[in-house]
């Protein structure tokens, strides 16, 4: 029977082992990074023998989000439906549940609970061989790498302005930066900042206009990631997104990685156009479901 836990789960390692078991069976991870990090957090969580559901409720309020996993040995018994239904009740009105890979069993659970798709997130990939040369920076802009915590305030400002609409990427605070710069995968040499170096009113010397945060997602398989690309409103329309993305791709290629991935909203036509021109194509599809 599913149990709601308000506080840390008893054995986070066992939950992560369950996640790894499901990923090996399905070929795709059942929990996103945010939810994997949250396994060791204060919750709320929904736990059961052979299953787990994480719940994220935004600090500023608004609809929560749910992700769930069921061990291969416990499937076909209604456990997934029980976990998701319980977690959605805790998450509150308007909450969504993510189906990573949008696999058939997840779609079946959604249908039984009367949920319909409300959002699609695409995983795009491309090989890191045969990259086009990185474009030159426009006049009045230089690109450098992360210099440490002194850059954090500007990073947060640009991130939150660029992603004010985004339910996960927007609304970051110092804790989100610290959590990621403290992660094992973080490399300051892979965080690229576009800095205004002109004298115009919209690009005073030293102003951060955009950044590209890269990630070595899986060194064992040679997979890198375009983790975050953000351009400040005053930097848009100048090709900075393409410039920063290209610089980061060359950095990942120099790390001897084979492939790079990124995530983009399925309805973000402008970003999809840019990434398609950069040689990316769809690899995975992730769908959020909610009550109509």
From Swiss-Prot:
Reaction it catalyzes: 1D-myo-inositol 2-(L-cysteinylamino)-2-deoxy-alpha-D-glucopyranoside + acetyl-CoA = mycothiol + CoA + H(+)
Entries under InterPro entries matching the protein: Acyl_CoA_acyltransferase, GNAT_dom, MshD_Acetyltransferase, Mycothiol_AcTrfase
Domain of life the protein comes from: Bacteria
GO terms assigned for molecular function: mycothiol synthase activity; protein-N-terminal-alanine acetyltransferase activity
Annotated EC: 2.3.1.189
Ligand binding (acetyl-CoA 1): 68-70
Keyword Glycosyltransferase: no
Ligand binding (acetyl-CoA 2): 229-231, 236-242, 268-273
CDD domains recorded: NAT_SF
Chain ranges of the N-acetyltransferase domain: 2-138, 141-292
NCBIfam families per UniProt: mycothiol_MshD (TIGR03448)
Assembly mode: Monomer.
Protein name in the entry: Mycothiol acetyltransferase
Organism: Tsukamurella paurometabola (strain ATCC 8368 / DSM 20162 / CCUG 35730 / CIP 100753 / JCM 10117 / KCTC 9821 / NBRC 16120 / NCIMB 702349 / NCTC 13040) (Corynebacterium paurometabolum)
